[in-house]
Amino acid sequence: MAKGIREKIRLVSSAGTGHFYTTDKNKRNMPGKFEIKKFDPVVRQHVMYKEAKIK
């Protein structure tokens, strides 16, 4: 079988709260680091989440 295009990533909050989301991304369409603004329930605000590897 062929290797899948999608890889699992972890989105870590830039607020420094330790909160994270897990998702996957298409390596071919988005080769760079993924950044998105999402809600952080610890600080109760929308903040930037940056891609990190799942350990």
Curated annotation (Swiss-Prot):
The keyword Ribonucleoprotein applies. InterPro entries: Ribosomal_bL33, Ribosomal_bL33_CS, Ribosomal_bL33_sf, Ribosomal_zn-bd. It holds the Pfam family Ribosomal_L33. One of its GO terms (molecular function) is structural constituent of ribosome. Keywords: Ribonucleoprotein, Ribosomal protein. It comes from the Bacteria. GO terms for cellular component: cytosolic large ribosomal subunit. GO terms for biological process: translation. Belongs to the bacterial ribosomal protein bL33 family. NCBIfam families: PRK00595.1, rpmG_bact. This is Large ribosomal subunit protein bL33.
